[in-house]
Every structure is written in C-alpha cells, then in structure tokens.
Amino acid sequence: MSLILASTSAIRRQLLDSAGVDYVAVKPDVDEAALKARLTDPTEIASELAAAKARSVPGDDWVIGSDSVVSVAGRLFDKPRDRAEAAEHLRFFSAKPMRLTSAVALARGGRVDWSHADSATLQVRSLSDKFIETYLDAEWPEVGYTVGVFRLEARGVQLFDRIDGDHFTILGMPLIPLLGALRERGLLQS
C-alpha cells in the first residue's frame, strides 16, 4: 500500500519530504472552478477542495489532498493569471489583514476518512508601488503559483507586519495534524 499526495504543489512536496514521509505525488483531477462557484466560505472551500483532491485518485492507496484559500476584505483570491494581476492583488492586500485557510484530507477508495482545516491571519504592511515591482522582479514567476502572491519561506515574509497562526498552515498544509492522522492509520511509525 502506498501513500499518494494529490498535488503538484512544490511546497507541499517539500513539507512531506522534510518530515520524512514516503509518498508518490500525482496531479489531482478536480474541477476547482466549479467547486468554488458554488461555495462562499473560505474554510468550506479549502476543505471541499482538499477532500475532492483526495477522492480524485482511485484505488486502495491512502491519498492526501490539500488546498489553501486566501481572503482579504471579504474577497476571495485565486492564483494570479499574470504578473500584472499579481501586482493588482498586492496593491489590494496592502495595509489589510489577510486570512489564509489551509485544509488537508486523507481518503482511501474514494472516501474521505479524515480531514482538518486551519486558518491564520497575516497583517500585510503598507506596500509601495516600488516595493511591489522590486518584489515581483525577484519572486516572479514562482509567486504566480500561490494564492496570496507570496512564499513565506522566501522574500514573501517581507510583506507582513504580523503573523498569527501555524507556520505549516501558512505554507499550505496543516502538517502536524496530518502527521498524527498518518500515525493513527499506521502510515508512519508512532
């Protein structure tokens, strides 16, 4: 029996690798836009997307699905389509609190057996246009693959005045609860 990560996210692979988890990564087959179109609550969206990704891989292997959602001033944000939209997002985020919700689900045989969601609040500092351009010069296109236009493990940490919440949740996966769930199922040593 294998453990599968239904994700193409580099940071989620890095988190599992660093924790010593053996897994195989596959691209999930999920219509994210359709799911997001019928939901409005960030926690519900992240949880449903994580569950859908975990259910998307057929067979008897355990499958991890995970997703993150960013909301600022009541508005949900997707990954930017291009650098210009990334700059627009950053200008909108400036001097506002950002809520980042990450969820993770564990499924087997197309059925979710366990899930967990967590949120963090990140206070975006006041960002000048010059900073935004310099930041994107250094971080684009990598931040184009993230919903908040930042990588906390890189220059993205400079966007914030204060961060309240779990580090792993902010990186994109509530890792500590997931590791506990894997141990409970005998997928990691206890």
What are these regions (language model features)?
Residues 1-21:
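N-terminal beta1-alpha1 ligand-phosphate binding loop
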Residues 8, 28, 109:
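Cofactor-binding loop segments of dinucleotide-utilizing enzymes, especially the Rossmann-like FAD-
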Residues 24-34:
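A short beta-strand-loop structural module common to alpha/beta enzyme folds
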